[in-house]
Amino acid sequence: MTQGSRLYFAVAVLMCGFVSINGVGLNDLLERASQLSDKLHSLSTSLTNDLDSHFPPVGRVMMPRPSMCHTSSLQIPNDKDQALKVPEDELLSLARSLLLAWSDPLALLSSEASSLAHPERNTIDSKTKELQDNINSLGAGLEHVFNKMDSTSDNLSSLPFDINSLGQDKTSRLVNFHFLLSCFRRDSHKIDSFLKVLRCRAAKKRPEMC
């Protein structure tokens, strides 16, 4: 079994785990969510490596700054120590807000991947569709976590994404695809970190053990 196949199988198992959710405790829900968010970050890293294997030098010059990511306006903890000070319901809202913010961008990436000017476009196309499917599964799982936590706050931030094209020429499209993916990879790491803090708190571990 290849690395990609193992990753796909692991994520598929986790997705199935969210289907039969009745009677599952909060600790187990957060464990499943943390595992899935970890797989998503691994998949986005693998995709980035695929793109980097044949990325034009001019693309590095054309790449927008990270501050141009559409989620950069969201005020979030910068590290684990800060995240440990954020209330549980607020931390969950941040993770859910980031997931929702990637619904449209991932749909755009999924629609563009198969026509990229890149020799690995078939692999990139397949992995991008996996990302889109799996982030939807994680979003559904976090809805169950929200309900299980009996939170009174459902304050989700709106992070609009108004782009419907990656560009007209092949280089621009490849650069913008890479840029969006780099933004997602950054955000998937944040989501993974937030969920691991929530999992640690649910297990009543000491902060220094998280």
Swiss-Prot record:
GO terms assigned for molecular function: hormone activity
Tissue specificity of this protein: Pituitary gland.
Assigned GO CC terms: extracellular space
InterPro entries named among the record's database cross-references: 4_helix_cytokine-like_core, Somatotropin/Prolactin, Somatotropin_CS
Top-level taxonomic group: Eukaryota
Keyword Chaperone included in the entry's annotation: no
Primary localization class, coarse: secreted
One GO process term, biological-process aspect: positive regulation of receptor signaling pathway via JAK-STAT
PROSITE patterns, A to Z: SOMATOTROPIN_1, SOMATOTROPIN_2
Pfam families xrefs: Hormone_1 (PF00103)
Signal peptide: 1-23
Paired cysteines (S-S): C69-C183, C200-C210
PANTHER family for the chain: PROLACTIN, SOMATOTROPIN,PROLACTIN
Record-stated family: Belongs to the somatotropin/prolactin family.
Name this protein carries in UniProt: Prolactin
Organism for this UniProt entry: Carassius auratus
